[in-house]
Amino acid sequence: MGDVMIQSVKTESGLVDGHHGSCDSLGCVVGALAKVAKLVVALAALVLNGALCVLSLVALCVGATPVGPLAVLVATTLASFLCVAYVLFIAAKDRGWIASTNKC
């Protein structure tokens, strides 16, 4: 069977009753895997972004790196930041990772 998740059902009295139901839908599994993949990509981009920021600051402080490679580092850092922003905010229809996961 599929994963068990809590579903809310509105009763005749207007109260919301929560109960456990199974989610066997392939769409739910694929949707959950897609959200996890987006999160992994975003976290990898954040790590890359942080590493490139540190490298560019070290190169700037030491003065051992010419301006050209430093500009490439800054541009790559900016591109990484934009990728994270796209994955986390623009590409996500629900504007969040935990919003309404029980659409089975």
Curated annotation (Swiss-Prot):
| Membrane topology of the entry | Multi-pass membrane protein
Write out the annotated subcellular location.
Answer: Secreted; Host vacuole, Host pathogen-containing vacuole, Host pathogen-containing vacuole membrane
Any idea which UniProt keywords this protein has? Host membrane, Membrane, Secreted, Transmembrane, Transmembrane helix, Virulence
Disulfide-bonded cysteines: none
Task: State the superkingdom.
Answer: Bacteria
Which sequence ranges are marked TM in the entry? Answer: 39-59, 70-90
- Annotated function: Inclusion membrane protein probably involved in early modification events of the chlamydial inclusion.
Q: Provide the protein name.
A: Inclusion membrane protein F
